[in-house]
Amino acid sequence: MLHWGPKYWRSLHLYAIFFSDAPSWKEKYEAIQWILNFIESLPCTRCQHHAFSYLTKNPLTLNNSEDFQYWTFAFHNNVNNRLNKKIISWSEYKNIYEQSILKTIEYGKTDFIGAWSSL
């Protein structure tokens, strides 16, 4: 069985983390396009439907990286809730990704997938 979810989540969260803290209109537009392409690329049509539905009900917040990260965090928890997987707090999310970013920078590798692989 192909476990594509953790890799998709990792790319989504990383995009939000490295998003600008003062994005231009062009950067916001590119982020919207990236999210739409991200959703369309999901290998599960039911997942695509749920993601588009979530996006419609919870529009992207692209004022800065923190807002965008919070949107991805809430989206991930929404999916986990629907799948009866663990829901994490905002502080847990920040710890997982901030620590993983530091490991990536320091050691040239990451443990993002290990951190949330069971979620």
Swiss-Prot record:
Cofactor: FAD
Reaction(s) catalysed (UniProt annotation): 2 R'C(R)SH + O2 = R'C(R)S-S(R)CR' + H2O2
InterPro entries hit by this protein: ALR/ERV, ERV/ALR_sulphydryl_oxid_sf, ERV/ALR_sulphydryl_oxidase
Highest taxon of the lineage: Viruses
Family annotation (SUPFAM superfamilies): FAD-dependent thiol oxidase
PANTHER family registered for this protein in UniProt: ALR/ERV (PTHR12645), FAD-LINKED SULFHYDRYL OXIDASE ALR (PTHR12645:SF0)
Function comment: FAD-dependent sulfhydryl oxidase that catalyzes the formation of disulfide bonds in viral proteins produced in the cell cytoplasm. Involved in virion maturation.
The protein's name in its UniProt record: FAD-linked sulfhydryl oxidase
